[in-house]
């Protein structure tokens, strides 16, 4: 008999009612008495489990009644509609085959476990409700983002993981080497001889696919990357991970306003898609993780995003009378408390802050006519503050070279990036969305470690 997914049974119960079906999955819960028992069976296709009713008519009734949690079974039985019960249907088992026994020391027992404990068993945590919901939403959200760009004719570019340049100029990068660390070759000055390494020069894990994406935007017009990025930032916080995923579109013949419009459209599209395609999971998050999740998402979807310059924002904050931990003055990088005040108290909706001081932004951002600010934007949202950062890129070769020199960066590392301005360069712009930060926002999960299947953080590379 062909296997039927539990999702299909829930989505089209009337079609299956009265039919004999085969389902297979893992035992989430089992209750039994002398003559009958109930199994909560989850097959991974759907957030909810299906209730299996079994009784002494089964040849192996006693064996089934003693099965440990997480044992895998294959069940044949009749679908019976139960409109008055908690679940819309159940399956009356006619046959249950044991596929794989679980040991009795299975760590996920019936009690509720803390997220901290579940991180120590990351290989088993997707079997819990919270992480089943989280990682299905992660999958659905990723698909939504791809679909958004594909529907608009964007080309998906696979940018390199190993790179010879530092996009952000931050220097917090993971080095890549095949050198024998017990016998590293040195040059005449006693420095590591990079020419003897695999690539013949210093290489690192990428912090962003943006520079490579710019090259392809100047050929395909509209492109995006969606891939892993790495930061060797020794921050043990709930918001930082050493490995995370970035969504980075790049559009040619575009200015800052165009990229803000794209940001707003993408965010609303992805949120609507998740609400439509993961209703059970989103209801779970709203009930058990963060009771403001649905309200927050609907606020984003139904709002026209605000816009304010950095200079105006500083003035608003200074005149607000609010007691901030970090003093507000022109030139500071806005702190989370400032960002949240603007989005929650002033605008009460998402807001783009634009035209930041050049000294707190990256070298590739277009210098404004005032010589002090750059055409950059951060999208601030109620609940967390900054969600997305974007900018118009500097298309003028001479200005870009000056910025690279001003920041003490090695111009030679960026020769190819500069050449893009030499051969038919044009105005172009893009943004970066930390995918995990987006997931934290829409699920209410408070720690980045809980929205990545196997998180990589300082001192932690288990699994």
From Swiss-Prot:
InterPro entries: Aa-tRNA-synt_II, aa-tRNA-synth_II, aa-tRNA-synth_II/BPL/LPL, Asn-tRNA-ligase, Asp/Asn-tRNA-synth_IIb, NA-bd_OB-fold, NA-bd_OB_tRNA. One of its GO terms (molecular function) is transferase activity. The keyword Ribonucleoprotein does not apply. It holds the Pfam family tRNA_anti-codon. It is found in: Cytoplasm. Disulfide bonds: none annotated. Its EC number is 6.1.1.22. Keywords: Aminoacyl-tRNA synthetase, ATP-binding, Cytoplasm, Ligase, Nucleotide-binding, Protein biosynthesis. It comes from the Bacteria. GO terms for cellular component: cytoplasm. GO terms for biological process: asparaginyl-tRNA aminoacylation. Its main location: cytoplasm. It catalyses: tRNA(Asn) + L-asparagine + ATP = L-asparaginyl-tRNA(Asn) + AMP + diphosphate + H(+). The keyword Manganese does not apply. Belongs to the class-II aminoacyl-tRNA synthetase family. Homodimer. NCBIfam families: asnS, PRK03932.1. This is Asparagine--tRNA ligase. It comes from Bacillus thuringiensis subsp. konkukian (strain 97-27). The gene is asnS.
């Amino acid at each position: 008999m062909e296997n039927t997914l539990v999702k299909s049974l829930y989505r089209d119960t009337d079609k299956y009612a009265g039919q004999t079906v085969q389902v297979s999955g893992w035992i989430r819960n089992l209750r039994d008495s002398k003559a009958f028992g109930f199994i909560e069976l989850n097959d991974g296709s759907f957030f909810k489990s299906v209730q299996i009713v079994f009784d002494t008519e089964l040849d192996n009734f006693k064996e089934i009644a003693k099965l440990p949690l997480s044992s895998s079974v294959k069940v044949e039985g009749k679908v019976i509609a139960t409109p008055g019960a908690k679940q819309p249907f159940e399956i009356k088992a006619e046959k249950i085959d044991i596929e794989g026994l679980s040991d009795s020391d299975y760590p996920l027992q019936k009690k509720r476990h803390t997220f901290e404990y579940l991180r120590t068993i990351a290989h088993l945590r997707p079997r819990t409700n919270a992480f089943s919901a989280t990682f299905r939403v992660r999958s659905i959200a990723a698909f939504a983002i791809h679909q958004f760009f594909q529907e608009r004719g964007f080309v998906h570019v696979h940018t390199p993981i190993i790179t010879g340049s530092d996009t952000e100029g931050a220097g917090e990068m993971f080095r890549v080497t095949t050198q024998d660390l017990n016998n590293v070759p040195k040059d005449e000055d006693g420095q590591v001889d990079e020419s003897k390494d695999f690539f013949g020069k210093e290489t690192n894990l990428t912090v962003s696919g943006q520079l490579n994406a710019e090259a392809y935007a100047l050929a395909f017009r509209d492109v995006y990357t969606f891939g892993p990025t790495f930061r060797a930032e020794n921050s043990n916080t709930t918001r930082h991970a050493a490995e995370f995923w970035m969504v980075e579109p790049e559009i040619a013949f575009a200015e800052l306003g165009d990229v803000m419009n794209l940001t707003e459209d993408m965010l609303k599209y992805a949120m609507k898609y998740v609400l439509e395609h993961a209703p059970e999971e989103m209801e779970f998050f709203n009930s058990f993780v963060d009771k403001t999740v649905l309200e927050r998402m609907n606020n984003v979807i139904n709002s026209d995003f605000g816009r304010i310059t950095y200079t105006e924002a500083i003035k608003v904050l200074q005149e607000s009378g609010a007691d901030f931990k970090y003093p507000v003055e022109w030139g500071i990088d806005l702190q989370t408390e400032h960002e949240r005040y603007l989005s929650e108290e002033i605008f009460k909706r998402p807001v783009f802050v634009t035209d930041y001081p050049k000294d707190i932004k990256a070298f590739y951002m277009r210098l404004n006519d005032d010589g002090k600010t750059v055409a950059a934007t951060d999208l601030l949202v109620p609940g967390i503050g900054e969600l997305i950062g974007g900018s118009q890129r500097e298309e003028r070769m001479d200005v870009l070279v000056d910025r690279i020199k001003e920041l003490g960066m090695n111009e030679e590392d960026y020769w190819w990036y500069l050449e893009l301005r030499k051969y038919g360069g044009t105005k172009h712009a893009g943004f970066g969305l930390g995918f995990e930060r987006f997931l934290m926002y829409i699920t209410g999960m408070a720690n980045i470690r809980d929205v990545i299947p196997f998180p990589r953080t300082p001192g932690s590379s288990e699994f």
